[in-house]
Amino acid sequence: MFTQANLFLILLLAIALIAKNQSLLFAVSVLLIIKIVGLDQKLFPTIQSKGINWGVTIITIAVLVPIATGEIGFKQLGEAMRSSYAWIALGAGIAVALIAKNGLTLLENDPHITTALVIGTILAVALFGGVAVGPLIGAGIAYLAMQIVKLFTS
């Protein structure tokens, strides 16, 4: 019961409680319950391999709700596109999606980088009120930085 993994999760649970971070609290609680119930061997591989995609899908659904409810329609889109801020947001959305695309590959292929990114994300979520989309975009930024370093060192 008191494995290194469980102790680490309990530590994260304590950090989540102290930081009053509901997302981290929920995530760690779910993982601990899965382990306690004994379903970790069955569920963890699937969660690990598909969880990021599930998360992106849930975020996408949440973002599309105003369109589904009719709160945002073609009229609002047309009005927004007349704003310079909308064009900046459009460009930022494209840039982030392209950066994150390479981050997904990096997360899947490099456990060393994944560990550092996950710890960084946990710290940001627990201590600074960050949002746990960090590993994906963080990996994308790391990938971009690595490519720049390669450019100047090879």
From Swiss-Prot:
It comes from the Bacteria. The lineage of its organism: Bacteria, Bacillati, Bacillota, Bacilli, Bacillales. Pfam families: DUF441 (PF04284). The gene is ytwI. Belongs to the UPF0756 family. Its main location: membrane. Keywords: Cell membrane, Membrane, Transmembrane, Transmembrane helix. It comes from Bacillus subtilis (strain 168). It is a multi-pass membrane protein. The chain crosses the membrane at residues 8-28, 54-74, 87-107, 117-137. One of its GO terms (cellular component) is plasma membrane. It is found in: Cell membrane. This is UPF0756 membrane protein YtwI. PANTHER family: UPF0756 MEMBRANE PROTEIN YEAL. InterPro entries: UPF0756_TM (IPR007382).
